[in-house]
A protein has these predicted regions:
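ATP-dependent carboxylate activation and anion-phosphoryl transfer catalytic cores
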Residues: 1-50, 60-63, 78, 100, ...
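A short helix-to-beta-strand connector/capping loop
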Residues: 27-28, 72, 102-105
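Catalytic-core regions of core metabolic enzymes
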Residues: 31, 71, 82-83, 115, ...
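N-terminal Rossmann-like NAD(P) cofactor-binding module of classical short-chain dehydrogenase/reductase
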Residues: 54
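Glycine-rich phosphate-binding loop
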Residues: 57
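Short Gly/Thr/Asp-enriched flexible loops that form oxyanion-binding sites at enzyme active sites
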Residues: 60-73
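A conserved helix-loop-beta module that forms one wall/lid of the active-site cleft
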Residues: 79-141
Length: 277
């Protein structure tokens, strides 16, 4: 908001959390204390008639309504809706990784026990990581070591539908997790740093600590991470910020996910490299 104001734009902030810095009275020209949901954002959009809406700086919530906003005629600035959809859809993103030759842990989706058993067999057996597809923050995630545990988990799962399946991934043993933030104008990609997690992969990144610069990641793995990040940003035609999450198992780098938005890690490389991302 401050950068846009310096460029001469009037800025409008939508945020219902009064504890955040973005709701300070001097951050934006106008501030709406409203839920970041389709109905409320549309009402503000029709009233203010802005040049466009930026969905990259509000965490996951704005991305969840980006497609619906676009369908209602809202102009989304930055990374395109189609690219956001690819990054958010596990099947589409995996197909892109296959095309780029970038490895991901074997995974699948299931809506019932038969599909779950078939998925585990396809992945290569136990242990597997299973979680609902419609929650954030690692809620409902569990490591499954045998068929009995799988049957018990699926039986207790609530709200599972074809649109909200269970996600099943191969469990990575003693894997190191790391992240990379990237900034792109659609052509050039800038990667300020790679962040190494203190905890092993599997601890939710919001509950873990990061180190900049990395301590135990090899130069070869660092080069691979930056190469993968650049290729993915270019393939998605990212215009703005992107956060990449990786896991390293036995010296091999696996992509976990791409977030086409600013992550909570953005201030870390900015502070450590003394360059604003």
């Amino acid at each position: 908001a401050m950068a846009l104001r310096e460029m001469g734009y009037e800025t409008i902030m939508v945020n219902c959390n009064p504890e955040t810095v973005s709701t300070d009275y001097d951050t934006s020209d106008k501030l709406y204390f409203e839920p970041v949901c389709l109905e409320d954002v549309l009402q503000i959009y029709h009233k203010e008639k802005p040049a466009g809406v930026i969905v990259q700086f509000g965490g996951q919530t704005p991305l969840n309504i980006a497609r619906a906003l676009s369908d209602e005629g809202v102009k989304i600035l930055g990374t395109s809706i189609d690219s956001i959809d690819i990054a958010e859809d596990r099947d589409l993103f995996r197909k892109m990784m296959d095309q780029l030759g970038i490895p991901m842990p074997e995974s699948g989706m299931a809506t019932n026990i038969d599909e779950a058993l078939a998925c585990v067999k396809q992945i290569g057996g136990y242990p597997v990581m299973i979680r609902p597809s419609f929650v954030l923050g690692g809620r409902g995630m569990e490591v499954i070591y045998d068929e009995n545990m799988l049957r018990e988990y699926v039986a207790k799962a609530v709200g599972v539908t074809p649109d909200r399946p269970l996600l099943i991934d191969r469990f990575l043993h003693n894997a190191l997790e790391c992240e990379a933030d990237a900034l792109s104008d659609g052509e050039h990609v800038y990667i300020p740093s790679v962040m190494e997690h203190v905890e092993l992969a599997g601890v939710h990144s919001g509950d873990s600590a990061c180190i900049i610069p990395p301590v135990t990641i090899t130069k070869e793995n660092l080069a691979t991470i930056k190469d993968y990040t650049r290729k993915i940003a270019e393939a998605l035609h990212v215009c703005g910020l992107m956060n990449m999450q990786y896991a390293i198992e036995d010296g091999k780098v696996f992509v976990l996910e791409a977030n086409p938005r600013a992550s909570r890690t953005v201030p870390l490389p900015q502070a450590s490299t003394e360059r604003a991302t």
